[in-house]
Swiss-Prot record:
Subcellular location: Secreted
Upper taxonomic lineage: Bacteria, Bacillati, Bacillota, Bacilli, Bacillales
Species annotation: Staphylococcus aureus (strain MSSA476)
Residues at the catalytic site: 238, 334, 355
Designated name of the protein: Staphopain A
Main location: secreted
């Protein structure tokens, strides 16, 4: 499937973190670690709308707990660090607000992304949407006591050190330059390195909260054997990755691989024609049928109850999305897999989704048909294929 390259965006960071864990984090509601250094993210300004801040503080633990249960992680305690923003090279924000979720060791486990609603396409009535995933958490944790900048373009995410060399740290599936170098020079005078304020993203902003009660009480439903076995590279095979993951889960096997699926369906294509080919819904249904399944096309997003019932019955669901930002180019259409669903302790219903580009899962409001993805784009969930 085809996609246009988005513009380069940038996030400036200065990181330094002590090796000593935060002391007495459970009991101290006003944590001020003056003797500790923290990850500092450069921002143009630290202003966050009150509605956004309240939404993050109110709901983050429920979202995080749903992912913890999906990952079969133990009960834990979390808090939020200071929120930060991501900028384009013209110093304009990408419009989102990012809240790091800290564990008691002072490391970032998840990123809460709050976005203004994409009004034209979204079925949600809320002004903002919230999504939680690992996103850049591992990257932020890898550069302790170093001054860095994070940049992103169509090739992925880069860490820029003080010598202005950019290292690719998070590759996206949009790579098309076979001669891509792992380091690139960044102009020293670039204005994104001159943002004046700093957000202490690893400084706890409130008392740590245990998710013990939420973990025990919160309803989470998952395809029992769903695992991330491979991720999408420089190709158009999102549907192949999606179907492979779903069939591996529902058959409890490791035999399905995206490339083999694509070769089965397009045996005569070679070279770049094969590399960048995609699949139609009809081809996706046909492949499921050849594997002993009876997939059905639904010309809309599946409801929460439908996801709940299908997942309980070990039937996989493929998401078919259309990119909001551009309907042309590679990945203008994109397939993703439904991992399961959860009902948060505030009653909100969410669907757990795996994007083949990612090494982790993400939460999606069950009433919102626009899915934000890890490169900053949004996909309108317009159809589903269920029964894998």
């Amino acid at each position: 499937m085809k996609r246009n390259f988005p513009k380069l965006i940038a996030l400036s960071l200065i990181l330094s973190l002590s090796v000593t864990p935060i002391a007495n984090a459970e009991s101290n509601s006003n944590i001020k670690a003056k003797d500790k250094k923290h990850v500092q993210v450069n921002v143009e300004d630290k202003s966050i709308p009150t509605e956004v801040r309240n939404l993050a503080q109110k709901d983050y633990l429920s979202y995080v707990t749903s992912l913890d249960k999906i990952y079969n992680k133990e009960k834990a305690s979390y808090t939020l660090g200071e929120p930060f923003k991501i900028y384009k090279f013209n110093k304009k924000s990408d419009g989102n607000y990012y809240f790091p979720v800290l564990n008691t060791e002072g490391n970032i486990d998840y990123i809460v992304t709050i976005s203004p609603k994409v009004t034209k396409y979204s079925s949600s009535s809320s002004k903002y949407t919230i999504n939680v995933s690992p996103f850049l958490s591992k990257v932020l944790n890898q550069y302790k006591d170093q001054q860095i900048t994070i940049l992103t373009n169509s090739k992925g995410y880069y860490v820029v050190t003080q010598n202005h060399k950019a290292k690719l740290v998070l590759k996206t599936p949009r790579l098309e330059d076979k001669k891509l170098k792992k380091t690139e020079s960044i102009p020293t005078g670039n204005n994104v390195t001159q943002l004046k304020q700093k957000a202490s993203v690893t400084m706890p902003t409130s008392q740590f909260k245990s998710n013990n009660y939420t973990y025990n009480e919160q309803y989470v439903n998952k395809l029992e054997n769903f695992k991330i076995r491979e991720t999408q590279g420089n190709n158009g095979w999102c549907a192949g990755y999606t179907m492979s993951a779903l069939l591996n889960a529902t058959y409890n096997t490791n035999k399905y691989h995206a490339e083999a699926v694509m070769r089965f369906l397009h045996p005569n294509l070679q070279g770049q024609r094969f590399q960048f080919t995609g699949l139609t819904p009809r081809e996706m249904i046909y492949f499921g049928q050849t594997q002993g399944r009876s997939p059905q096309l639904l010309n809309r997003m599946t409801t929460y109850n439908e996801v709940d019932n299908l997942t309980k019955n070990n039937k996989g669901i493929a998401v078919l999305g259309s990119r909001v930002e551009s309907r042309n180019g590679m990945h203008a259409g994109h397939a993703m897999a439904v991992v399961g669903n959860a009902k948060l302790d505030n009653g909100q219903e969410v669907i757990i989704i795996w994007n083949p580009w990612d090494n982790g899962f993400m939460t999606q409001d069950a009433k919102n048909n626009v899915i934000p993805v890890s490169n900053g784009d949004h996909y309108q969930w317009y159809s589903s294929i269920y029964g894998y």
